[in-house]
Every structure is written in structure tokens, then in C-alpha cells.
Curated annotation (Swiss-Prot):
Disease affiliated with this protein: Microtia, hearing impairment, and cleft palate: A disease characterized by microtia, mixed symmetric severe to profound hearing impairment, and partial cleft palate. Microtia is a congenital deformity of the outer ear that is small and abnormally shaped. In classic microtia, the pinna is essentially absent, except for a vertical sausage-shaped skin remnant. The superior aspect of this sausage-shaped skin remnant consists of underlying unorganized cartilage, and the inferior aspect of this remnant consists of a relatively well-formed lobule. Microtia with or without hearing impairment: Microtia is a congenital deformity of the outer ear that is small and abnormally shaped. In classic microtia, the pinna is essentially absent, except for a vertical sausage-shaped skin remnant. The superior aspect of this sausage-shaped skin remnant consists of underlying unorganized cartilage, and the inferior aspect of this remnant consists of a relatively well-formed lobule.
Keywords: Developmental protein, Disease variant, DNA-binding, Homeobox, Nucleus, Transcription, Transcription regulation
Annotated organism of origin: Homo sapiens (Human)
Functional description taken from the UniProt entry: Sequence-specific transcription factor which is part of a developmental regulatory system that provides cells with specific positional identities on the anterior-posterior axis.
Name of the protein: Homeobox protein Hox-A2
Family stated for the protein in its record: Belongs to the Antp homeobox family. Proboscipedia subfamily.
One MF annotation (Gene Ontology) recorded for this entry: DNA-binding transcription repressor activity, RNA polymerase II-specific
Length: 376
């Protein structure tokens, strides 16, 4: 073999193959392997499962075809039959610690069931609160623990203690448990639950207070917004009222100015006939006081009026014509009627003779004034 290695080393990049290396080593003694397997299976057949090589025949060195061809002795069938290989492969072994755990569970359940059976058989016995709770805890079977039922006195004392101390030290907890006939664990659990309840209550109160504050803030904001809207509305109303007042005032001023404009024209027209009216009144008064001279004045007036109506003389232009009387207003008509009416009966009663032309002139003027007043 060494000669073969030396011969191959002479070539470049020549290395021995894996098959040559495996075949070059001497085979391991099959007797040692078989004896060790037999002793192990016989001594630890109950505790240790069979080796992995025996369960899978392809991994067994004796089943390899090359080794079988090499003249290795096969394991005896008697030894393979004597070993409990199929039992270990089908069923997992049971170890001592597993047996102890199951036995402990069964023994723990038996006394509780026996105690419950004795209590039921003997009738209502006088048991303490702690023993009844222990029986209830044990009879639950470990699946679910029953809820502890506290008496009113126990709850009162626990609430009193919680009011002063939210957390209990161990000596105080032991003392309370001894006084109230409870276990230390029950007192501890009660205080834990009570602290959680207190926390929930405080959180709910804080949330309610915060919500109340938020609501109050929202309400105040809404009230402020409403007040602002009201003030804006009132301001708008006041502004609109002021505008309406101004518009009404301007409208009234315009109406007054429009009314004053024709009145002004009437006033201008009234100013023209005022002098003849006043002169007529004076003349009428003068007629009453000076009766002898009246026929001369009236005759001259009648002649002048007739001349003004018939001829285009310059004297006729001074006398108001019929067109000038068309501008008279109602006040001027009333004044004229008041001025003329008292003079007529006086003139009729007086012995003075009035000509027909002057009477015709007065009647014509009055009829024209009345017609114009009706048309207006």
C-alpha cells in the first residue's frame, strides 16, 4: 500500500481517492461491536431505548453489501430476536419521574374527595372559613379556583385597613389574616383587587372631570359665539336703521323741496297780485269812507277795464288781465272773495250807483278763479 502511495505521489496533482483511503485501513473487529451492543441491550433494556443504528437497517454496518462481500460475519438472528427492539420502537418508555408526578396528582385528589365525601355523609359540620375555602379549592380539580366569599365583617375590616393603608407589609398582612380567619394569600389578593378598583374609580372621575371641563369650555365658547353673533346682528340692524333714517330724511327733504318748489312759484305768482289786492282793499275801504268820490273812481276803473279788454292801449297793460288771474292759488282766491264780498252788500246798500261794466268785471274774475281752482 505504501508502494502505491509513493507511486501516485510521483505524478503531478495526483491525490489518493476517498475509496482507496477507506479500503486501505484494516476493518474494525465486528466481534467487539456485537458484544458491546448485546451487553448494552441486555443490561439497559428497560431504561435506554435501542441504538439508532439498529432501528434503521441501512445504517447497520453489517447490512452493507460491500462489507458482506468482504467476508464479515453477520449478526446472529438469535441475538436480534432476543433484544426487545420492536417494543421500544413502538412504545415510548416510561421514566420514574413521570410515574411520580402522576402518582402525586392522584394522591392530592384523593384526600380532597374523601373529605368532601365525609362532609356530605356526616351532614352540615361546623367548619371554619379557612377549611371550607381549602376544600373548595381542592375540589375544583385545579382547573378553576372558586371565588372567595367574604363576610360583611371581613369586608368591613379590609375596607377600613385599605382606607388607611393601600399597601400592607408582611407582618400586618399576617396579623389581619389571623384576625379575620383568612389566609395570607387571600388578604394579598383582596388588596390587589381593591387597588385596581380604586385606580379605575379615580381614572373615571378624572375622565368625567376632564369631559365636564371640556363641555363647560365648549358651552362658554358657544355662548361667546352667540353673543358675538347677536352683537354683530344688532350692529347691522343699527347701521341699517341709520341708513334708513338717512334715506327717509333725504326723501322727506326731497319731498319738501319738491313741495316748496311749486309753492315758491305760487308765492312768486302771489306776490304779483298782492299789490292789487291790497290796493283793492284800500280802495274798497276808501270807497266806504268817501262815498261822494266813488262814482268817479269806479267810472274811471270801468273805463280803463273796458279799454284794456277791448283795445291794446298802454294803460291796459298795467291792469291785471284774465291770464294773470289764472296763476292765483286757493289762498289768494279766498282772500279775494273775503275782500270782495263785504264790499258788495255795502255798495248795494249805498245810494251810490255802480255801473254795469264794473259788476261784469268782478263776476268774470270770480268765475275764472273758481274754474281754475276746480281744474287744479
Amino acid at each position: 500500500m505504501n508502494y502505491e502511495f509513493e507511486r501516485e505521489i510521483g505524478f503531478i496533482n495526483s491525490q489518493p481517492s476517498l475509496a482507496e483511503c477507506l479500503t486501505s485501513f484494516p476493518p474494525v473487529a465486528d466481534t467487539f461491536q456485537s458484544s458491546s451492543i448485546k451487553t448494552s441491550t441486555l443490561s439497559h433494556s428497560t431504561l435506554i431505548p435501542p441504538p439508532f443504528e439498529q432501528t434503521i437497517p441501512s445504517l447497520n454496518p453489517g447490512s452493507h453489501p460491500r462489507h458482506g462481500a468482504g467476508g464479515r460475519p453477520k449478526p446472529s438472528p438469535a441475538g436480534s430476536r432476543g433484544s426487545p427492539v420492536p417494543a421500544g420502537a413502538l412504545q415510548p418508555p416510561e421514566y420514574p419521574w413521570m410515574k411520580e408526578k402522576k402518582a402525586a396528582k392522584k394522591t392530592a385528589l384523593l384526600p380532597a374527595a374523601a373529605a368532601a365525601a365525609t362532609a356530605a355523609a356526616t351532614g352540615p359540620a361546623c367548619l371554619s372559613h379557612k377549611e371550607s375555602l381549602e376544600i373548595a379549592d381542592g375540589s375544583g380539580g385545579g382547573s378553576r379556583r372558586l371565588r372567595t366569599a367574604y363576610t360583611n365583617t371581613q369586608l368591613l375590616e379590609l375596607e377600613k385597613e385599605f382606607h388607611f393603608n393601600k399597601y400592607l407589609c408582611r407582618p400586618r398582612r399576617v396579623e389581619i389574616a389571623a384576625l379575620l380567619d383568612l389566609t395570607e394569600r387571600q388578604v394579598k389578593v383582596w388588596f390587589q383587587n381593591r387597588r385596581m378598583k380604586h385606580k379605575r374609580q379615580t381614572q373615571c372621575k378624572e375622565n368625567q372631570n376632564s369631559e365636564g371641563k371640556c363641555k363647560s369650555l365648549e358651552d362658554s365658547e358657544k355662548v361667546e359665539e352667540d353673543e358675538e353673533e347677536k352683537t354683530l346682528f344688532e350692529q347691522a340692524l343699527s347701521v341699517s336703521g341709520a341708513l334708513l333714517e338717512r334715506e327717509g330724511y333725504t326723501f322727506q327733504q326731497n319731498a319738501l323741496s319738491q313741495q316748496q318748489a311749486p309753492n315758491g312759484h305760487n308765492g312768486d305768482s302771489q306776490s304779483f297780485p298782492v299789490s292789487p289786492l291790497t290796493s283793492n282793499e284800500k280802495n274798497l275801504k276808501h270807497f266806504q269812507h268817501q262815498s261822494p268820490t266813488v262814482p268817479n273812481c269806479l267810472s274811471t276803473m270801468g273805463q280803463n277795464c273796458g279799454a284794456g279788454l277791448n283795445n291794446d292801449s298802454p294803460e291796459a297793460l298795467e291792469v291785471p288781465s284774465l291770464q294773470d288771474f289764472s296763476v292765483f292759488s286757493t289762498d289768494s282766491c279766498l282772500q279775494l272773495s273775503d275782500a270782495v264780498s263785504p264790499s258788495l252788500p255795502g255798495s248795494l246798500d249805498s245810494p251810490v250807483d255802480i255801473s254795469a261794466d264794473s259788476l261784469d268785471f268782478f263776476t268774470d274774475t270770480l268765475t275764472t278763479i273758481d274754474l281754475q281752482h276746480l281744474n287744479y
